[in-house]
Swiss-Prot record:
The gene is thiI. Belongs to the ThiI family. One of its GO terms (cellular component) is cytosol. This is tRNA sulfurtransferase. Residues 404-482 form the Rhodanese domain. Residues 61-165 form the THUMP domain. Its EC number is 2.8.1.4.
Length: 482
């Protein structure tokens, strides 16, 4: 199989040296992502495109899907690569491939050509289009609004018959910009803002301030791992968890009620800045949007920024909530966010929308900053790829089974797309489908007299979800690993 990767247009307008660097980085990213699917896979870079060739036909759909989620790719062409002898031979090959697709449809032919030939692109379009029109009685030519466009590419002595075109996510390849640290809470905003910086070419590390115990941390780990696995798995990234309960306790005890929200955010920025400095990260990323909550007015945001010299990026600053939720839905993080509690908003009953710097500083003078230093020094840093292994250690009480009893129910928690690609077919056991992002809200509706064996492809999400359900009080869960 062969795929032609077309570059994001902004890459093509860069200077020659920058363009070559971007293409080289994108080629490496593609290799890193796809090596898990086919060890014999080849990735070859060219000036205006990248070729991906693989032998394992069973991985075709998985490879194609992975390519559509790699930043820097504008679109992917799935092609058949053949030799040709002349224009008539090009027509014959196009007829064999497109006959069924064109029956009863209007169509046009579009040709791109590279190299020196005795014919022009228009010559091929006219000859192939005329031939298809003559040989397929129910097909009709329509050059302005065709139902089917026959795409052909001719490269020197090779003919590329384009079987399908699939849109990528665009943006810059990860690694072309500097690293950032995303303050992730698991809600709608932080997930979308993290994705937006990945799409713009940044390697995004994650910093989580734990205010809700083990269940909260597991939930946020799921979101971070999902985002990384789906859009950023070409690079190793860090997940840093900071136990912020002592800081919140100090704020509740020492700070005036109306100033608590701004002070808490300033403490988070200070802590995250120390983490960023420790790992050489250039900027923080937050999901704040102007006026969304009391701490996100211009006055308050300015005071929050002043707590540190580290640059703070807010990609959602002008977005409204409806748009953010729509983006989260498209990314697949909406259902995570729906079940994620918002802890930051509960500590202040009458938050100020226009904090005064002198008053904030006066309130912070009562705060014991040794507590902040301590929680930062105790921050836990893990490679996000180790979340699976860490979960194994945390979930020692979760039983992993390779077989099942007749009364067990196998719960397929993979995404609907994964279930469609590789449906489970097992005898002597009831199989139910409940995607992982719906477990938090719908598991309680299942028959709790039965034992549920959670299944996912690699066992990462099933272990995370098993721990999460145990934290919620459900003891009738196991992990199924055949």
């Amino acid at each position: 199989m062969k795929f032609i990767i077309k570059l994001f247009p902004e890459i093509t307008i860069k200077s020659q040296s920058v363009r070559l660097r971007f293409i080289k980085i994108l080629t490496g990213n593609i290799r890193n992502v796809l090596k898990h699917y086919d060890e014999t896979l080849a990735v070859v870079r060219h000036w205006d495109h990248i070729e991906v060739r693989a032998k394992d036909e069973s991985q075709r759909s998985a490879i194609r899907d992975a390519l559509t989620r790699i930043p820097g790719i504008h679109h992917i062409l799935e092609v058949e690569d053949h030799a040709y002898t002349d224009v008539h031979n090009i027509f014959e090959q196009a007829l064999a491939l497109y006959r069924e697709q064109l029956e009863g449809k209007t169509f046009c032919v579009r040709v791109k050509r590279r190299g020196k030939h005795e014919f022009s692109s228009q010559d091929v379009e006219r000859y192939v289009g005329g031939g298809l029109n003559q040989h397929i009685e129910t097909a009709r030519v329509n050059l302005t609004a065709p139902q089917v466009t026959v795409h052909l590419e001719i490269e020197q002595d090779r003919l590329l018959l384009i079987k399908g075109r699939y849109e990528g996510i665009g943006g810059f390849p990860i690694g072309t910009q500097e690293d950032v640290l995303s303050l992730i809470s698991g809600g709608f905003d932080s997930g979308v803002s993290s994705y937006m910086l990945m799409r713009r070419g940044c390697r995004v590390h994650y910093c989580f301030f734990n205010l809700g115990g083990a269940a909260h941390e597991i939930g946020v780990k799921q979101v971070a791992h999902y985002l990384w696995n789906r859009f950023g798995s070409s690079h190793r990234v860090r997940f840093i968890a900071i136990d912020f309960d002592p800081v919140v306790g100090e704020i509740l005890e020492k700070v005036d009620d109306g100033q608590m929200g701004v002070v808490l955010k300033r403490m988070m920025v200070r802590a995250a800045s120390k983490i960023a400095e420790r790992y050489g990260v250039q900027a923080l990323v937050t999901g704040e949007a102007l006026g969304q909550v009391s701490s996100q007015t211009l006055t308050n945001l300015r005071l929050i920024d002043n707590a540190s010299d580290t640059l703070i990026l807010r990609p959602l600053i002008s977005h409204d909530k409806e748009h953010i939720i729509k983006q989260a839905r498209e990314l697949g993080t909406e259902d995570f966010a729906k079940t994620m509690p918002e802890y930051c908003g509960v500590i202040s009953k009458s938050p100020t929308v226009k904090a005064v710097k002198a008053k904030i500083e006066a309130e912070e003078s009562h705060f014991d900053f040794a507590i902040l230093e301590r929680v930062v020094s105790e921050a836990r840093n893990i490679d996000i790829r180790q979340i699976a292994e860490q979960t194994k250690q945390e979930v020692v009480e979760i039983e992993t089974v390779a077989s099942f009893a007749p009364t067990d129910v196998l719960l397929d928690i993979r995404s609907p797309d994964e279930q469609d690609d590789k449906p489970l077919e097992l005898d002597q056991i009831e199989i139910k489908s409940l995607p992982f992002y719906k477990l938090g809200t719908q598991f309680g509706d299942l028959d709790q007299s039965k034992t549920y064996l959670l299944y996912c492809e690699r066992g990462v999400m099933s272990r995370l979800q098993a721990l999460y359900l145990r934290e919620q009080g459900f003891s009738n869960v196991k992990v199924y690993r055949p």
